Structures are given as structure tokens and as C-alpha cells.
Amino acid sequence: MSSVTGFYIPPISFFGEGALEETADYIKNKDYKKALIVTDPGIAAIGLSGRVQKMLEERDLNVAIYDKTQPNPNIANVTAGLKVLKEQNSEIVVSIGGGSAHDNAKAIALLATNGGEIGDYEGVNQSKKAALPLFAINTTAGTASEMTRFTIISNEEKKIKMAIIDNNVTPAVAVNDPSTMFGLPPALTAATGLDALTHCIEAYVSTASNPITDACALKGIDLINESLVAAYKDGKDKKARTDMCYAEYLAGMAFNNASLGYVHALAHQLGGFYHLPHGVCNAVLLPHVQEANMQCPKAKKRLGEIALHFGASQEDPEETIKALHVLNRTMNIPRNLKELGVKTEDFEILAEHAMHDACHLTNPVQFTKEQVVAIIKKAYEY
């Protein structure tokens, strides 16, 4: 087995107020002529996609828009967006939004060059050709989908989320302009911020972690601990929003290279079955999965180390679990899976599907089906 470790991030990333204009100038200087914007109805309604469209048109690009991406984007979203791209013969894709818009755009850009159906690329590095260049403008902090090689697409017929982990879907440019996040509602700030925290923690206890991903994960936790609640309480807090831009990007650097674990493996199934918000599912599951992970000595030690980054006086994994529950309560996250509408009769199939999700492969403990069901049950009854 090779001992070589790769580290994957976009070639270019822009941060700070004014990053939108910087990105538009960069696209013009590359001499592209036709762009497809992929976004969602909410971003279209507040005028942000129109603003980016105007910037690009002022720089002599012809712009088409697909703005029907739904939360937890599905195969139909990918197909419809690809149709718009082909009609215009777009050279590049510009995604605007959170994880849903970016994931849909990645899938569209991948199919534009590789052909076939998006399900053909489920798993790790199944494509042969580079996707069309993707410029990912982020509006949440967040999924980090604007900078990762992950894309998650729902197969509604099978009630599953397909995890496509492929170097070829890595965006060409990632854009984090905190001014696009000032209007983010508190509930979405909480859900996306806790998604970023889950990325940090799962990457830190991952079997594929390394010193670089560890540094990214721990710094991400520090920034989230300092700034997430502040951003939740005051969405226009410029420092908190800026810190969260960096935090979610650091989290992305961590999990893009160390991968994830059973929190995400289970959250994907909850999203596929019940169309629940991804970040909320992660937040509810995170303490329970990590508690189960403590049977692994290395994971237990690392969870103890994380406690120091939450302000504990000593390494204690129980303090980390406690801090996660407190953070959830502070930001009004549902207490358990029961409150989210999960059904007890689905526990078995949720567990089975999670055990086939690529994210479980780097969890520090390879649970039996009975253990996965027990985790779901605990998260349901808590």
C-alpha cells in the first residue's frame, strides 16, 4: 500500500469584502465568453445571482442561469441544469449559494465533460476527465462545498444521498465574501456553522488524518468556538462573519483530505429519507457518534484534546461531548431525532444505508449494524 498522502484544495481562493468583484475580473482576464450560473430560488429572490450576472455581463460574458436548485439537490436538478448549460454551450460554471448550489454545479460541470448519469460517479474518483471550470461563490459558513472534492446528490427514488468524492469536481476558484452572509438567518447560521464544526471534529478523529489536516481542524474549532454564537446572535457582526468564512474553509481543508465519519454517513441518510437540513442532522448526531467513538483509544484521546479548544481546563472527552450539547441548546437546535420526525421503523434501513456511505470508511470505529442502530436510537431518545 502506498504511503503517499495527497492534499487537495482549489488552485485559487478569494476571501474578504470585494471578493465578488475580484472573481469577476479574474474570469474576464481568462477570456471566457459563456457562463452558466447555478443557484437556488432564495439567492435569486434576494438579487445576488442577478448582481453577479450583471458583473459578468459588464465584462462581456454571455450568462445563462439555472436557479431551481433545491435543498439536498437531486438528479432532476442536475439534469435540468445540464440542459441549460448545453443549450448555451457554456464554457464555465459559476455557483452561488451554500452546499446545495455548489453540489449541483459540480455535478453539472462533471457531466458536461464526462457524460453519462451522475450516479455513474458515486464513490471515489470514478471520472476520467476534468470538469468544466467551476467558480464557487459561497454564501454560508458552511458546507465548504465551494472548495472540496465532494458532491452530494439525492437519489429520491432510492431515498439515498450519493456521495461523489472526485478530484475532478474540485472548483477552480473558491470565493468567500462575508458581505454575502450578513443577511443569513440565525437558524441557517447555526445549522451551517455546526456543519463546519462537524467537519473539523470528524476530520480530527478520522483514520486518514495527518498533521496538516489536524492543524486545519483545530484552528477551525478555535474560530467556531469564538465566533459562531456571535454570528448567530448578530448576523451583521463583520468580524464574526469573517472568522466563520475562514473557519468553514479550514474545516473544508481538513475533511477534504482526511474525510469524515459516521456523523455524515448517517446525516446523508436522514437527508435522503426525510429531506431534513444537513447541518441540523449533523448537529444532533455529532455528540452521540463521538461518544460511541470513544471506544477507540486514539479517538478518545483526540476528543479529550478538543475539549481544551472549547475552554476546558484539561483534556477530557466528556467535556467535549458536553460542550457540543450546550452549543446545540444555545442555538436552538432540535434536541433529538424524534423532534426531527425520524421514525423508529426506519432505524434498520438507515443503519444499512449508512454502512454503505463512503464517509463511514474513515470513522475511527467500524461499527456493526447493531451498534449503528444503537447510536440512532440514542440520538432519537436523548
Swiss-Prot record:
TM spans (from-to): none
Could you cite one Gene Ontology molecular function of this protein?
metal ion binding
pH-linked activity: Optimum pH is 8.3.
Q: Where in the cell is it found?
A: Mitochondrion
Q: Which cofactor does it need?
A: Zn(2+); Fe(2+)
Q: What induces it?
A: Induced by transcription factor ZAP1 in response to zinc deficiency.
Q: What class of enzyme is it?
A: oxidoreductase
Q: Which Pfam families match?
A: ADH_Fe_C, Fe-ADH
- Top-rank taxon: Eukaryota
Quick one: a GO biological-process term for this protein?
A: amino acid catabolic process to alcohol via Ehrlich pathway
Return the cofactor note field: Zinc. May bind iron when zinc levels are limiting.
Q: Write out the residues that bind NAD(+).
A: D40, N72, G99, S100, T139, T140, T148, F150, K161, G183, H268, H278
Give the EC number: 1.1.1.1
Q: Where does Fe(2+) bind?
A: D195, H199, H264, H278
List the keywords (alphabetical).
Iron, Metal-binding, Mitochondrion, NAD, Oxidoreductase, Zinc
Q: Name one GO cellular component term.
A: mitochondrion
Among CDD domains, the record links this protein to: PDDH
Could you tell me what this protein does?
A: Alcohol dehydrogenase specific for ethanol. Acts mainyl as a mitochondrial formaldehyde dehydrogenase and has no effect on ethanol production. Shows drastically reduced activity towards primary alcohols from 4 carbon atoms upward. Isomers of aliphatic alcohol, as well as secondary alcohols and glycerol are not used at all. The role of ADH4 in yeast metabolism is not yet known, but ADH4 is not responsible for the production of ethanol during growth on glucose nor responsible for the oxidation of ethanol to acetaldehyde.
Q: Which family does it belong to?
A: Belongs to the iron-containing alcohol dehydrogenase family.
What more the UniProt record tells us is:
While ADH4 is expressed at only low levels in laboratory strains, it is often highly expressed in brewing strains. Present with 125 molecules/cell in log phase SD medium.
Q: What is this protein called?
A: Alcohol dehydrogenase 4
Protein's organism: Saccharomyces cerevisiae (strain ATCC 204508 / S288c)
